[in-house]
Regions:
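Active-site/ligand-binding loops adjacent to catalytic centers
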Residues: 1-46, 92-118
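Substrate-binding/catalytic subdomain of NAD(P)-dependent oxidoreductase enzymes
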Residues: 47-59
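Catalytic phosphate/nucleotide-handling subdomain of diverse soluble enzymes
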Residues: 58-118
Length: 118
C-alpha cells in the first residue's frame, strides 16, 4: 500500500520480484513507520515522505537483525520523496495522536466478496 502515491495495489515488477523470491513483503504499522521517519530525519537531515517511512522502517529492522547476528550486508531502500507536504501527519505522530490500525480478516473478506459481485 502506498496511499500518498495514489496507487492501492501491487505493481507488476514488484509482484514478479515477490513471485521469484527476489524480495519479500513485510508489514509495517504506521507508528513504527513514523518512528523510522523521525530517525532518518535526525540522521540525514531529510524529512521523508510517509510512504518512504515504511521502507525506512524495514531497512532499520534488517539493520537491527544484522547487528544482532553480526552479519554484514548492503541494505537498499527507495526514498520516494520528501515529507514537507505531510508535516501535519508528523505533527499528529509527535503529539501522540496517531495509532496503528489493522482491518480484521472478516472485513477484508467481506470487501473482497463485494468486489466479486460487481
Amino acid at each position: 500500500h502506498a496511499g500518498g502515491l495514489r496507487y492501492h495495489g501491487a505493481g507488476v515488477i514488484v509482484s514478479q520480484l515477490l513471485k521469484d523470491n527476489l524480495m519479500e513483503a513485510v508489514d509495517i504499522q504506521q507508528l513504527e513507520s513514523f518512528e523510522a521517519g523521525c530517525l532518518f530525519a535526525q540522521a540525514e537531515g531529510i524529512i521523508p515522505a510517509p510512504e518512504s517511512c515504511h521502507a525506512i522502517a524495514a531497512a532499520v529492522r534488517e539493520a537491527e537483525k544484522c547487528k544482532e547476528t553480526g552479519e554484514e550486508k548492503v541494505i537498499l531502500f527507495n526514498l520516494s520523496g520528501h515529507g514537507l507536504i505531510d508535516m501535519a501527519s508528523y505533527d499528529q505522530y509527535l503529539a501522540g495522536n496517531l495509532m496503528n490500525y489493522e482491518l480484521k480478516d472478516e472485513d477484508i473478506q467481506k470487501n473482497l466478496d463485494e468486489i466479486k459481485n460487481m
